[in-house]
Amino acid sequence: MSEAVWHDGEDVVLRLYIQPKASRDKIVGLHGEELKIAITAPPVDGKANAHLTKFLAKQFKVAKGLVHIEKGELGRHKQIRIESPVQIPTEIKAII
């Protein structure tokens, strides 16, 4: 099991490194002991967090309210909990 992604009961917990202002939204892959995700939103006024939440909700096929930022609200390093995901993206399945 990876340090970047693990199961906690029915939930999935992700340790992320976020790259804001990227050319497109993408799960890049492992970045040290974290999962790197590139997002197009700038890191201003919570826009990157809102965009990240929406992107992850779409990837895991859950409502945005089921994606929680547990740590790192104001930084690039974050810990995210996804409650009872319907699907696990292929890029993440490969490292679990």
Curated annotation (Swiss-Prot):
Family matches, as InterPro entries: DUF167, YggU-like_sf
One Pfam family matching this protein: DUF167
Gene Ontology cellular-component annotations: cytoplasm
Alphabetical list of HAMAP family matching this protein: UPF0235
Family assignment from sequence similarity: Belongs to the UPF0235 family.
Name this polypeptide is given: UPF0235 protein VIBHAR_03581
Organism: Vibrio campbellii (strain ATCC BAA-1116)
